[in-house]
UniProtKB/Swiss-Prot annotation:
One of its GO terms (cellular component) is nucleus. It comes from Danio rerio (Zebrafish). Residues 223-258 form the DMA domain. Residues 98-203, 424-448 are annotated as: Disordered. This is Doublesex- and mab-3-related transcription factor 3a. The gene is dmrt3a.
Length: 448
């Protein structure tokens, strides 16, 4: 009890003290000064000592003046704090210039002062303030018609009177409503004055290769981020923008940075055209005919039907089964490398789900990057034009297997087993010496 009893006994004291004044009935202070107990509610206009000028009653009048001045000061401070908070909450975007805001804030402040003066009337004298306070203390039935102050015995007794009487809470909601109505009326012309100008448009300076994006001023903070992305990037599909926004966790600035960085990486390569159909698979199923046009090579060497176009293993399974390959080659082509490719086809499963549908943005970027690097490898090794024997060697190379073996290789590689796929690239009747030779040595011997 000694270790734990004293804190609980100490904390129990202040809790029991505020409960007692809440249960007492407010009494008239002037009558109490003269030895009479009278209930305060409805008593002000009938008090027999309301015109008394004794020392105790004069002291009560002075206390009422002090309390009325304090109440008026607190109301004014609350009004000023409310005026300073509401315009700051309307400033949502970070890049707004301050010059136009200050010009519109000055008439707004003067309007607030005018409205406050008209609501409160002329400045009151301390006697009027004390009368108003005493009218609030007297109760709802008094009506506040009499201007004579009512006596309160002490500040300790006046505080419970302020808390218990219902009239003290009545003027404050009216003032709050007038303040909110004033703030609404002041905030209404703000978008009207800012929208037709569009001069202080904020700029989001995004670090990236493509520069910055200027957001229009009409995009306020209450707009959903998806609508903002649709207005900034109208060429992108809404489903793509929604997925990018979900990947960023709803962060609008992060989604804009990702879209800008993806656009800046694809601009120098000229992989995707500016139209929206660049993300849709063409009707004939040839995905990589457009990116090959960015290379300044003659069409005779790099035509669609040549031996060095994009291999069929990078195409969809519907195309490989349909046999759409034009040109002199009737069998599907493979790379001339016996080793497994540097970039395995890990995206084939994700792309073959919707075989004729649109691509996702990141898949197309990574897909085209793989294709371009493989084309650079092919160009670096097969730059000299091939004559009849060289083309015949490549066409009759044992690396070019039949279509069932290609399907077997694709299915094995989808199961991420590159070792078996490497062995299936050779024919069954091939010698071990031919297998040990690398593709580079065979190509050099053939070209020489």
């Amino acid at each position: 009890m000694n270790g734990y009893g004293s804190p609980y006994l100490y904390m129990g004291g202040p809790v029991s003290q505020p409960r007692a004044p809440l249960q007492r009935t407010p009494k008239c202070a002037r009558c109490r000064n003269h030895g009479v107990l009278s209930w305060l509610k409805g008593h002000k206009r009938y008090c027999r000592f309301k015109d008394c000028t004794c020392e105790k009653c004069i002291l009560i009048i002075e206390r009422q003046r002090v309390m009325a001045a304090q109440v008026a000061l607190r109301r004014q401070q609350a009004n000023e704090s409310l005026e300073s908070l509401i315009p700051e909450s309307l400033r949502a975007l970070p890049g707004i210039t301050v010059s136009s805001g200050e010009q519109s804030a000055n008439p707004r402040a003067s309007d607030i002062d005018l409205r406050w003066n008209t609501e409160t009337g002329t400045p009151k004298t301390p006697q009027d303030l004390s009368d108003e306070l005493s009218g609030e203390q007297s109760g709802g039935e008094n009506g506040g018609s009499d201007r004579e102050p009512e006596a309160v015995s002490s500040p300790e007794e006046s505080k419970p009177n302020l808390c218990c009487t219902p009239d003290t809470s009545d003027p404050s909601p009216q003032l709050e409503e007038s303040r909110f109505g004033l703030s609404k009326s002041c905030s209404d012309p703000e978008p009207k004055s800012d929208n037709p100008k569009y001069s202080p448009e904020p700029n989001l300076l995004i670090e990236g290769l493509s520069g910055s994006v200027s957001l229009p001023f009409s995009l306020r903070a209450n707009r959903p981020p998806l609508e903002v992305l649709k207005k900034i990037f109208p060429a992108h599909k809404p489903a793509v923008l929604e997925l990018i926004l979900k990947g960023c966790g709803g962060d609008l600035v992060g989604a804009i940075e990702i879209l800008l960085s993806s656009r800046s990486t694809m601009k120098p390569e000229k992989i995707l055209s500016e139209s929206s159909d660049a993300l849709v698979l063409p009707s004939n199923g040839h995905l990589f005919e457009h990116p090959l046009s960015s290379y300044p090579v003659s069409s005779s060497k790099w035509s669609v039907g040549s031996a060095f176009r994009v291999p069929d293993s990078l195409r969809f399974s519907s195309e490989s089964s349909g046999g759409v390959v034009p040109g002199p080659l009737s069998m599907p082509l493979q790379h001339g490398f016996p080793q497994p490719p540097r970039y395995p086809l890990m995206l084939r499963n994700s792309l073959s789900r919707g075989q004729a549908g649109p691509f996702m943005h990141n898949d197309v970027t990574l897909w085209n990057t793989m294709t371009l690097q493989q084309q650079y490898q092919l160009r670096s090794q097969y730059v000299p034009p091939f004559s009849g024997p060289s083309a015949g060697v490549i066409r009759s190379s044992p690396l070019l297997t039949s279509r069932p073996s290609e399907e077997h290789r694709i299915s094995i590689q989808e199961e991420s087993c590159p070792v078996i796929a490497k062995q299936s690239m050779y024919a069954a009747d091939e010698e071990y010496d031919d297998r040990s030779d690398s593709s580079d040595s065979r190509i050099l011997n053939t070209s020489s």
